[in-house]
Amino acid sequence: YNLIPNLTVRENIEVGAYLSDKPLDVNALLHTLGLYEHQRKLPNQLSGGQQQRTAIGRAIVKNPDILLCDEPTGALDYNTSKDILRLIETVNQKYGNTVVMVTHNDAIKDMADRVIKLRDGMIRKNYTNEQKIPAMELEW
C-alpha cells in the first residue's frame, strides 16, 4: 500500500494534503474512510483493508480531478474488497472526481459508468454501462 511505516494513519494522509493547493479536510476524510478511530495507529497496527483505506485517503485528500486505482482489491478478501469498492464509490459521489480503475476482477465493471476492456495492449471493448450496480451488490 506504500504507506510510510513510521507515520500514523493521520500523518500518512496529511502527506498527501501537503502536496495539494486545494486539499480536503483531513478530519472529514478520516470519518468518510472509517479511520477516525484509528488515526493514531501505525500501518503495522492496521488490517489490510484499513491500510488500503489509508492509501486511498492519501490519494483523495489531494482532491484530484482524476483518481487512478490500480487493482484496489487485489490483495484483499471478498468482504474487505466490497468495503473498498463501496468506499471508492462513496468518495466518487461525495467529491465528484473521475475514478479510473484498473482490475482483473471482471465483476467490478458492473459498477462503472464506462468500461474499457484491454487485451494485449489493445482496446477490445469500449462501452457505457446503462445499468450500474452498487458496489455492495456486486458478486464474484
Feature locations, PLM:
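Conserved ABC ATPase signature
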Residues: 42-52
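Conserved ABC ATPase "signature" region
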Residues: 14, 21-37
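Helix N-cap at the start of a conserved alpha-helix in ABC-type nucleotide-binding domains
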Residues: 78-80
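Conserved catalytic motifs of ABC-family nucleotide-binding domains
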Residues: 63
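Short coil-to-helix segment of the ABC ATPase nucleotide-binding domain corresponding to the Q-loop/switch region
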Residues: 5-14
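Catalytic Walker B motif of ABC-type/P-loop ATPase nucleotide-binding domains
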Residues: 67-70
